[in-house]
């Protein structure tokens, strides 16, 4: 018995990094493909720092966060088809929320602000909101990973009652402490973001911004 817990913990701890390695390899291959195409077209001013920042920080973190969410779905269901269904619901849910104008990144799970890059200013000030929301949702992903560890079982046991009993057995002082710290950090970061986006500044949806831009264009057109 004393050897089974370390093996179980090792198996769980190795799964999330292995899953996250898949999008990382894909992005690395995309960067290499970009460089190869540029070289074939006789362009040799390679901006490797920009490529890797755009791929792994701007795009990569989005993929990693969604990977963790899908990983938790597989843990809770232990069924690949139900896990695929959860992924489909997540994608459709984001589309529905956009259509209903619920677009705030504080509650659109793992949806990060867009970043704009220009040759003159680089990413400029657009990267700051991205960094804060990335921190916010990364903390939430850490909470999901802890929950995943609590409900993780090996073998064919799929009953939620068994998973709940296993989770209660693992919910010791270390797990509770880590959960509490991450929840406090998550709430604190969310409050700071809300203060900056909704109190210090005026928050508006995409449609509201488009309408304001159209009105400004009509005004100055005269």
Can you annotate each of these PLM segments?
Residues 43, 81-166, 189-211, 219:
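Terminal transmembrane helical anchor/hairpin motif
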Residues 52-55, 124-134, 172-179:
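Membrane-water interface of alpha-helical transmembrane segments
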Residues 178-192:
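Hydrophobic membrane-insertion alpha-helices, especially the h-region
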Residues 17-78, 116-119, 129:
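Secretory targeting signals
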Residues 8-16, 163-174:
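Interfacial transmembrane-helix boundary/kink motif in multi-pass membrane proteins
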Residues 1-25:
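Helix-loop-helix units of permease transmembrane domains in multi-pass membrane transporters
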Residues 75-88, 173-182:
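Alpha-helical transmembrane segments and their helix-start/interface "positive-inside/aromatic belt" motifs
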Residues 1-3, 7-9, 70-74, 149-164:
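Cytoplasmic membrane-interface regions of multi-pass membrane proteins
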């Amino acid at each position: 018995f004393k050897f089974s817990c370390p093996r179980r913990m090792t198996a769980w701890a190795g799964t999330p990094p292995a899953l996250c390695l898949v999008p990382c390899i894909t992005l690395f291959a995309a960067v290499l493909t970009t460089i190869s195409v540029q070289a074939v077209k006789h362009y040799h001013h390679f901006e490797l720092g920009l490529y890797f920042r755009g791929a792994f920080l701007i795009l990569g973190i989005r993929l990693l966060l969604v990977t963790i969410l899908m990983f938790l779905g597989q843990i809770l269901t232990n069924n690949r088809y139900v896990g695929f269904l959860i992924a489909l619901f997540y994608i459709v849910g984001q589309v529905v929320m956009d259509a209903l104008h619920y677009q705030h990144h504080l509650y659109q799970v793992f949806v990060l602000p867009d970043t704009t890059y220009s040759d003159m200013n680089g990413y400029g000030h657009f990267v700051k909101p991205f960094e804060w929301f990335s921190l916010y949702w990364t903390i939430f992903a850490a909470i999901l990973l802890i929950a995943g560890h609590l409900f993780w079982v090996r073998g064919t046991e799929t009953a939620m009652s068994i998973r709940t009993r296993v989770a209660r057995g693992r919910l010791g002082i270390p797990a509770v402490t880590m959960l509490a710290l991450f929840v406090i950090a998550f709430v604190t970061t969310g409050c700071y973001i809300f203060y900056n986006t909704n109190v210090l500044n005026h928050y508006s949806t995409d449609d509201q911004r488009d309408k304001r831009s159209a009105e400004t264009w009509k005004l100055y057109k005269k």
